[in-house]
Amino acid sequence: MFKFHLITKDGKARRGRIYTPHGVIETPVFMPVGTQGTVKAMLHKLLDEIGTQIILGNTYHLYLRPGTEIIKKAGGLHRFISWNKPILTDSGGYQVFSLAKGKFGNRKAKVKVSDEGVEFQDHLQGDKHFFTPEKVVEIQEIFGSDIMMPLDECVEYPVDKNYAEKALKRTINWLERSIKAKKREDQVLFGIVQGAFWKDLRKKAVEETLKFDEFLFGYSIGGLSVGEPKEIMYGMTEVVCELLPEKKPRYLMGVGKPEDILEAVERGVDMFDCVVPTRNARTGTLYTSQGVVDIRHSKWKEDFSPLDPECDCYTCRNFSKAYLRHLFVAEEISAYVLNTIHNLRFYLKMMEEVRKAIEEKRFKELKEKYLQRVKNKL
Protein backbone atom coordinates (compact mmCIF):
# COMPACT_ATOMS: atom_id res chain seq x y z
CA MET A 1 0.00 0.00 0.00
CA PHE A 2 2.78 2.42 0.98
CA LYS A 3 6.18 2.28 -0.69
CA PHE A 4 9.14 4.58 -1.32
CA HIS A 5 11.23 3.97 -4.41
CA LEU A 6 14.55 5.80 -4.75
CA ILE A 7 14.91 6.10 -8.53
CA THR A 8 18.24 7.87 -8.96
CA LYS A 9 20.65 10.38 -7.42
CA ASP A 10 22.75 13.31 -8.57
CA GLY A 11 25.36 13.74 -5.86
CA LYS A 12 23.24 13.68 -2.69
CA ALA A 13 20.12 15.04 -4.47
CA ARG A 14 17.51 12.27 -4.69
CA ARG A 15 14.79 11.50 -7.22
CA GLY A 16 12.14 9.24 -5.76
CA ARG A 17 8.52 8.12 -5.75
CA ILE A 18 6.12 7.59 -2.83
CA TYR A 19 3.15 5.26 -3.30
CA THR A 20 0.10 5.93 -1.08
CA PRO A 21 -3.56 4.75 -1.04
CA HIS A 22 -4.54 8.12 -2.55
CA GLY A 23 -1.96 8.27 -5.31
CA VAL A 24 1.69 8.50 -6.24
CA ILE A 25 3.94 11.39 -5.16
CA GLU A 26 6.99 12.21 -7.28
CA THR A 27 9.87 13.53 -5.16
CA PRO A 28 11.43 15.95 -4.39
CA VAL A 29 7.99 17.43 -3.73
CA PHE A 30 6.61 20.71 -2.44
CA MET A 31 3.37 20.37 -0.46
CA PRO A 32 1.08 23.42 -0.38
CA VAL A 33 -0.17 24.14 3.13
CA GLY A 34 -3.91 23.67 3.64
CA THR A 35 -3.95 24.64 7.31
CA GLN A 36 -7.72 24.52 7.87
CA GLY A 37 -8.63 22.02 5.15
CA THR A 38 -8.02 24.48 2.34
CA VAL A 39 -5.04 26.18 0.74
CA LYS A 40 -5.73 29.88 1.30
CA ALA A 41 -7.22 31.67 -1.75
CA MET A 42 -7.30 28.41 -3.78
CA LEU A 43 -9.84 25.84 -4.93
CA HIS A 44 -9.01 22.14 -5.29
CA LYS A 45 -9.65 22.38 -9.04
CA LEU A 46 -6.99 25.09 -9.28
CA LEU A 47 -4.56 23.03 -7.18
CA ASP A 48 -5.08 20.13 -9.60
CA GLU A 49 -4.49 22.34 -12.63
CA ILE A 50 -1.11 23.59 -11.37
CA GLY A 51 0.16 20.08 -10.59
CA THR A 52 -0.33 19.71 -6.82
CA GLN A 53 0.41 16.13 -5.73
CA ILE A 54 -0.25 16.33 -1.98
CA ILE A 55 -1.44 18.94 0.50
CA LEU A 56 -0.73 19.45 4.18
CA GLY A 57 -3.38 19.77 6.89
CA ASN A 58 -2.85 21.09 10.40
CA THR A 59 -3.99 18.96 13.34
CA TYR A 60 -4.18 21.85 15.82
CA HIS A 61 -6.40 24.05 13.66
CA LEU A 62 -8.66 21.24 12.39
CA TYR A 63 -9.05 19.83 15.91
CA LEU A 64 -10.32 23.22 17.09
CA ARG A 65 -12.44 23.99 14.03
CA PRO A 66 -14.48 22.26 12.67
CA GLY A 67 -13.50 19.64 15.28
CA THR A 68 -12.82 15.92 15.12
CA GLU A 69 -16.50 14.91 15.50
CA ILE A 70 -17.58 16.72 12.34
CA ILE A 71 -14.65 15.33 10.33
CA LYS A 72 -15.45 11.85 11.69
CA LYS A 73 -19.12 12.15 10.68
CA ALA A 74 -18.03 13.30 7.21
CA GLY A 75 -16.03 10.09 6.81
CA GLY A 76 -12.56 11.55 7.31
CA LEU A 77 -10.62 14.54 6.07
CA HIS A 78 -10.44 13.47 2.40
CA ARG A 79 -14.23 13.26 2.20
CA PHE A 80 -14.84 16.35 4.30
CA ILE A 81 -12.74 18.57 2.04
CA SER A 82 -13.39 16.59 -1.20
CA TRP A 83 -9.71 15.98 -1.96
CA ASN A 84 -8.85 12.57 -3.41
CA LYS A 85 -5.06 12.92 -3.48
CA PRO A 86 -2.64 12.31 -0.58
CA ILE A 87 -2.79 14.40 2.60
CA LEU A 88 -0.05 14.83 5.20
CA THR A 89 -1.07 16.08 8.64
CA ASP A 90 1.37 17.56 11.13
CA SER A 91 0.97 16.94 14.85
CA GLY A 92 -0.04 20.48 15.80
CA GLY A 93 2.92 20.61 18.18
CA TYR A 94 4.61 23.54 16.45
CA GLN A 95 1.39 25.58 16.61
CA VAL A 96 0.85 24.73 20.28
CA PHE A 97 4.38 25.83 21.21
CA SER A 98 3.92 28.97 19.09
CA LEU A 99 0.91 29.99 21.20
CA ALA A 100 3.23 30.95 24.05
CA LYS A 101 4.90 33.47 21.74
CA GLY A 102 1.59 35.04 20.70
CA LYS A 103 1.85 33.90 17.07
CA PHE A 104 -1.92 33.36 16.81
CA GLY A 105 -4.45 35.99 17.81
CA ASN A 106 -3.55 39.08 19.80
CA ARG A 107 -2.35 37.56 23.05
CA LYS A 108 0.15 35.10 24.40
CA ALA A 109 -1.39 31.90 25.74
CA LYS A 110 -0.24 29.72 28.62
CA VAL A 111 1.52 26.56 27.44
CA LYS A 112 2.70 23.96 29.98
CA VAL A 113 4.95 21.15 28.78
CA SER A 114 5.46 17.97 30.78
CA ASP A 115 6.62 14.47 29.93
CA GLU A 116 2.95 13.51 29.76
CA GLY A 117 2.05 16.06 27.06
CA VAL A 118 1.23 19.72 26.45
CA GLU A 119 -1.47 21.77 28.16
CA PHE A 120 -2.48 24.92 26.31
CA GLN A 121 -5.16 27.53 25.82
CA ASP A 122 -6.44 27.80 22.26
CA HIS A 123 -6.29 31.06 20.31
CA LEU A 124 -10.02 31.10 19.50
CA GLN A 125 -11.86 31.06 22.86
CA GLY A 126 -8.99 30.63 25.29
CA ASP A 127 -10.27 27.16 26.27
CA LYS A 128 -7.86 24.71 27.88
CA HIS A 129 -6.77 21.56 26.04
CA PHE A 130 -4.28 18.77 26.67
CA PHE A 131 -2.38 17.11 23.81
CA THR A 132 -0.68 13.80 24.54
CA PRO A 133 1.13 11.71 21.92
CA GLU A 134 -1.76 9.24 22.07
CA LYS A 135 -4.40 11.93 21.57
CA VAL A 136 -2.56 13.43 18.60
CA VAL A 137 -2.39 10.01 16.91
CA GLU A 138 -6.08 9.41 17.68
CA ILE A 139 -7.03 12.77 16.10
CA GLN A 140 -5.01 12.04 12.96
CA GLU A 141 -6.50 8.55 12.69
CA ILE A 142 -9.95 10.14 12.74
CA PHE A 143 -8.77 12.49 9.97
CA GLY A 144 -7.46 9.53 7.96
CA SER A 145 -4.52 11.43 6.48
CA ASP A 146 -2.07 9.31 4.51
CA ILE A 147 1.01 10.50 6.40
CA MET A 148 0.94 11.38 10.11
CA MET A 149 3.40 13.18 12.35
CA PRO A 150 3.92 12.34 16.04
CA LEU A 151 3.81 14.99 18.76
CA ASP A 152 7.25 16.53 19.24
CA GLU A 153 8.76 19.42 21.17
CA CYS A 154 10.09 22.13 18.90
CA VAL A 155 12.45 24.56 20.67
CA GLU A 156 13.07 28.14 19.60
CA TYR A 157 16.29 29.90 18.59
CA PRO A 158 18.34 30.60 20.61
CA VAL A 159 17.87 27.90 23.25
CA ASP A 160 19.88 26.51 26.17
CA LYS A 161 21.62 23.28 25.16
CA ASN A 162 20.54 21.45 28.31
CA TYR A 163 16.91 22.24 27.57
CA ALA A 164 17.36 21.24 23.91
CA GLU A 165 18.61 17.84 25.08
CA LYS A 166 15.64 17.49 27.42
CA ALA A 167 13.25 18.32 24.55
CA LEU A 168 15.02 15.77 22.36
CA LYS A 169 14.53 13.01 24.97
CA ARG A 170 10.89 14.00 25.38
CA THR A 171 10.36 13.87 21.60
CA ILE A 172 11.82 10.33 21.48
CA ASN A 173 9.62 9.24 24.39
CA TRP A 174 6.57 10.72 22.66
CA LEU A 175 7.50 8.91 19.43
CA GLU A 176 7.55 5.57 21.24
CA ARG A 177 4.13 6.29 22.74
CA SER A 178 2.79 7.40 19.33
CA ILE A 179 3.92 4.12 17.74
CA LYS A 180 2.15 2.14 20.49
CA ALA A 181 -1.02 4.21 20.04
CA LYS A 182 -1.19 3.83 16.24
CA LYS A 183 -3.91 1.41 15.08
CA ARG A 184 -4.71 2.07 11.42
CA GLU A 185 -2.80 0.15 8.74
CA ASP A 186 -3.77 2.55 5.94
CA GLN A 187 -1.76 5.43 7.42
CA VAL A 188 1.97 5.78 8.00
CA LEU A 189 3.95 7.58 10.68
CA PHE A 190 7.18 9.54 10.31
CA GLY A 191 9.75 9.97 13.07
CA ILE A 192 10.77 13.56 13.82
CA VAL A 193 14.45 14.34 14.37
CA GLN A 194 14.98 17.24 16.78
CA GLY A 195 18.26 18.25 18.45
CA ALA A 196 18.13 22.01 17.93
CA PHE A 197 21.35 23.62 16.69
CA TRP A 198 24.09 21.24 17.85
CA LYS A 199 25.58 18.51 15.68
CA ASP A 200 26.05 16.11 18.59
CA LEU A 201 22.39 16.48 19.63
CA ARG A 202 21.20 16.02 16.05
CA LYS A 203 23.31 12.86 15.74
CA LYS A 204 21.94 11.59 19.03
CA ALA A 205 18.38 12.35 17.87
CA VAL A 206 18.91 10.33 14.68
CA GLU A 207 20.41 7.40 16.61
CA GLU A 208 17.50 7.34 19.06
CA THR A 209 14.85 7.74 16.35
CA LEU A 210 16.39 4.96 14.24
CA LYS A 211 15.69 2.51 17.07
CA PHE A 212 12.07 2.63 15.89
CA ASP A 213 12.90 2.34 12.18
CA GLU A 214 10.72 -0.73 11.55
CA PHE A 215 7.62 1.26 12.60
CA LEU A 216 8.41 4.40 10.59
CA PHE A 217 7.77 5.05 6.90
CA GLY A 218 10.01 8.11 6.77
CA TYR A 219 11.83 10.79 8.73
CA SER A 220 11.13 14.46 9.35
CA ILE A 221 13.75 17.05 10.23
CA GLY A 222 12.10 19.37 12.75
CA GLY A 223 13.10 22.45 14.69
CA LEU A 224 14.68 24.40 11.83
CA SER A 225 13.66 27.66 10.13
CA VAL A 226 12.85 29.11 13.56
CA GLY A 227 15.10 32.16 13.30
CA GLU A 228 18.53 30.52 13.18
CA PRO A 229 21.15 31.67 10.59
CA LYS A 230 21.00 29.89 7.22
CA GLU A 231 24.37 28.21 7.67
CA ILE A 232 23.06 26.52 10.83
CA MET A 233 19.90 25.38 9.05
CA TYR A 234 21.88 23.93 6.15
CA GLY A 235 24.49 22.41 8.46
CA MET A 236 21.94 20.63 10.66
CA THR A 237 20.08 19.37 7.57
CA GLU A 238 23.31 17.93 6.18
CA VAL A 239 24.27 16.23 9.47
CA VAL A 240 20.86 14.55 9.72
CA CYS A 241 20.61 13.49 6.06
CA GLU A 242 24.02 11.81 6.20
CA LEU A 243 22.77 9.54 8.99
CA LEU A 244 19.23 8.76 7.80
CA PRO A 245 18.41 5.52 5.93
CA GLU A 246 18.81 5.82 2.16
CA LYS A 247 15.62 3.96 1.36
CA LYS A 248 13.15 6.10 3.32
CA PRO A 249 11.76 9.57 2.48
CA ARG A 250 13.06 12.67 4.28
CA TYR A 251 10.89 15.69 5.06
CA LEU A 252 12.25 19.10 6.09
CA MET A 253 9.37 20.61 8.05
CA GLY A 254 8.25 24.19 7.44
CA VAL A 255 11.21 25.15 5.24
CA GLY A 256 10.13 26.70 1.99
CA LYS A 257 11.97 29.68 0.55
CA PRO A 258 13.09 28.61 -2.96
CA GLU A 259 16.78 28.95 -2.10
CA ASP A 260 16.34 26.90 1.09
CA ILE A 261 14.50 24.13 -0.78
CA LEU A 262 17.29 23.93 -3.37
CA GLU A 263 20.01 23.83 -0.71
CA ALA A 264 18.13 21.07 1.13
CA VAL A 265 17.52 19.03 -2.03
CA GLU A 266 21.27 19.17 -2.65
CA ARG A 267 21.77 17.70 0.84
CA GLY A 268 19.31 14.85 0.28
CA VAL A 269 15.83 16.06 1.36
CA ASP A 270 12.72 14.77 -0.47
CA MET A 271 9.71 16.65 0.94
CA PHE A 272 8.92 20.28 1.80
CA ASP A 273 6.02 22.40 3.01
CA CYS A 274 5.77 26.10 3.75
CA VAL A 275 3.31 29.00 3.76
CA VAL A 276 5.85 31.27 2.00
CA PRO A 277 4.41 31.09 -1.56
CA THR A 278 0.79 31.55 -0.46
CA ARG A 279 1.50 34.18 2.20
CA ASN A 280 3.75 36.16 -0.14
CA ALA A 281 1.05 36.00 -2.82
CA ARG A 282 -1.37 37.68 -0.43
CA THR A 283 1.14 40.45 0.33
CA GLY A 284 2.01 41.05 -3.34
CA THR A 285 5.42 39.35 -3.54
CA LEU A 286 5.53 37.18 -6.66
CA TYR A 287 8.27 34.83 -7.93
CA THR A 288 9.09 34.89 -11.65
CA SER A 289 11.73 33.56 -14.04
CA GLN A 290 13.17 37.09 -14.24
CA GLY A 291 13.20 37.75 -10.50
CA VAL A 292 10.94 38.66 -7.58
CA VAL A 293 8.16 41.15 -8.32
CA ASP A 294 6.51 43.44 -5.78
CA ILE A 295 3.22 43.85 -7.62
CA ARG A 296 2.22 46.80 -5.41
CA HIS A 297 4.90 49.02 -6.93
CA SER A 298 3.77 51.89 -9.16
CA LYS A 299 6.33 50.86 -11.82
CA TRP A 300 3.88 48.14 -12.95
CA LYS A 301 1.01 50.61 -13.37
CA GLU A 302 1.32 50.71 -17.17
CA ASP A 303 3.13 47.42 -17.76
CA PHE A 304 0.80 45.38 -19.96
CA SER A 305 3.14 42.40 -20.33
CA PRO A 306 2.47 39.07 -18.58
CA LEU A 307 3.73 38.64 -15.04
CA ASP A 308 6.09 35.89 -16.25
CA PRO A 309 6.34 35.07 -19.98
CA GLU A 310 7.90 31.67 -19.13
CA CYS A 311 5.07 30.62 -16.78
CA ASP A 312 2.19 28.42 -17.98
CA CYS A 313 -0.25 29.24 -15.15
CA TYR A 314 -3.73 30.74 -15.69
CA THR A 315 -2.60 34.09 -14.26
CA CYS A 316 0.36 34.51 -16.61
CA ARG A 317 -1.51 33.23 -19.67
CA ASN A 318 -4.31 35.76 -19.25
CA PHE A 319 -3.37 38.89 -17.30
CA SER A 320 -0.87 41.73 -17.33
CA LYS A 321 1.19 43.12 -14.48
CA ALA A 322 -0.81 46.35 -14.74
CA TYR A 323 -4.09 44.48 -14.18
CA LEU A 324 -2.69 42.38 -11.33
CA ARG A 325 -1.40 45.55 -9.67
CA HIS A 326 -4.80 47.22 -10.11
CA LEU A 327 -6.60 44.27 -8.48
CA PHE A 328 -4.16 44.22 -5.57
CA VAL A 329 -4.29 47.97 -4.93
CA ALA A 330 -8.11 47.86 -5.19
CA GLU A 331 -8.08 45.02 -2.61
CA GLU A 332 -10.08 42.73 -4.86
CA ILE A 333 -10.34 39.13 -3.63
CA SER A 334 -9.37 37.90 -7.11
CA ALA A 335 -5.92 39.47 -6.61
CA TYR A 336 -5.16 36.94 -3.87
CA VAL A 337 -6.44 34.06 -5.99
CA LEU A 338 -4.48 35.01 -9.12
CA ASN A 339 -1.30 35.73 -7.17
CA THR A 340 -1.56 32.43 -5.27
CA ILE A 341 -2.14 30.43 -8.46
CA HIS A 342 1.05 31.91 -9.86
CA ASN A 343 3.31 31.57 -6.80
CA LEU A 344 2.30 27.96 -6.20
CA ARG A 345 2.79 27.14 -9.88
CA PHE A 346 6.26 28.72 -9.72
CA TYR A 347 7.12 26.39 -6.83
CA LEU A 348 5.60 23.28 -8.38
CA LYS A 349 7.22 23.96 -11.75
CA MET A 350 10.55 24.47 -9.98
CA MET A 351 10.14 21.05 -8.35
CA GLU A 352 9.24 19.48 -11.72
CA GLU A 353 12.46 20.93 -13.14
CA VAL A 354 14.41 19.76 -10.07
CA ARG A 355 13.19 16.19 -10.56
CA LYS A 356 14.12 16.25 -14.25
CA ALA A 357 17.53 17.80 -13.52
CA ILE A 358 18.35 15.09 -10.97
CA GLU A 359 17.41 12.43 -13.53
CA GLU A 360 19.69 14.11 -16.10
CA LYS A 361 22.52 14.68 -13.56
CA ARG A 362 22.47 18.48 -13.91
CA PHE A 363 20.96 19.55 -10.60
CA LYS A 364 23.75 21.98 -9.64
CA GLU A 365 23.30 23.87 -12.90
CA LEU A 366 19.54 24.19 -12.31
CA LYS A 367 20.09 25.23 -8.71
CA GLU A 368 22.35 28.12 -9.78
CA LYS A 369 19.77 29.26 -12.33
CA TYR A 370 17.03 29.44 -9.69
CA LEU A 371 19.27 31.06 -7.09
CA GLN A 372 19.94 33.91 -9.54
CA ARG A 373 16.20 34.29 -10.12
CA VAL A 374 15.25 34.65 -6.48
CA LYS A 375 18.15 37.01 -5.74
CA ASN A 376 17.01 39.42 -8.44
CA LYS A 377 14.49 41.96 -7.08
CA LEU A 378 12.57 43.58 -9.94
Swiss-Prot record:
Requisite cofactors: Zn(2+)
Binding site for Zn(2+): 311, 313, 316, 342
GO biological process: queuosine biosynthetic process; tRNA wobble guanine modification; tRNA-guanine transglycosylation
Recorded superkingdom: Bacteria
InterPro entries, per the entry: ArchSynthase1/Queuine_TRR (IPR050076), TGT (IPR004803), TGT-like_sf (IPR036511), tRNA_ribo_trans-like (IPR002616)
Alphabetical list of SUPFAM superfamilies matching this protein: tRNA-guanine transglycosylase
Bound cofactor: record note: Binds 1 zinc ion per subunit.
Gene3D superfamilies: Queuine tRNA-ribosyltransferase-like (3.20.20.105)
UniProt EC number: 2.4.2.29
Signal peptide annotation: none
GO MF term set: metal ion binding; tRNA-guanosine(34) queuine transglycosylase activity
Active site: 90, 273
Catalytic activity as recorded in UniProt: 7-aminomethyl-7-carbaguanine + guanosine(34) in tRNA = 7-aminomethyl-7-carbaguanosine(34) in tRNA + guanine
Region ranges (RNA binding): 254-260, 278-282
Pathway per the UniProt entry: tRNA modification; tRNA-queuosine biosynthesis
PANTHER family per record: QUEUINE TRNA-RIBOSYLTRANSFERASE
Protein family: Belongs to the queuine tRNA-ribosyltransferase family.
Known role: Catalyzes the base-exchange of a guanine (G) residue with the queuine precursor 7-aminomethyl-7-deazaguanine (PreQ1) at position 34 (anticodon wobble position) in tRNAs with GU(N) anticodons (tRNA-Asp, -Asn, -His and -Tyr). Catalysis occurs through a double-displacement mechanism. The nucleophile active site attacks the C1' of nucleotide 34 to detach the guanine base from the RNA, forming a covalent enzyme-RNA intermediate. The proton acceptor active site deprotonates the incoming PreQ1, allowing a nucleophilic attack on the C1' of the ribose to form the product.
Quaternary structure and partners: Homodimer. Within each dimer, one monomer is responsible for RNA recognition and catalysis, while the other monomer binds to the replacement base PreQ1.
Protein's name in the database: Queuine tRNA-ribosyltransferase
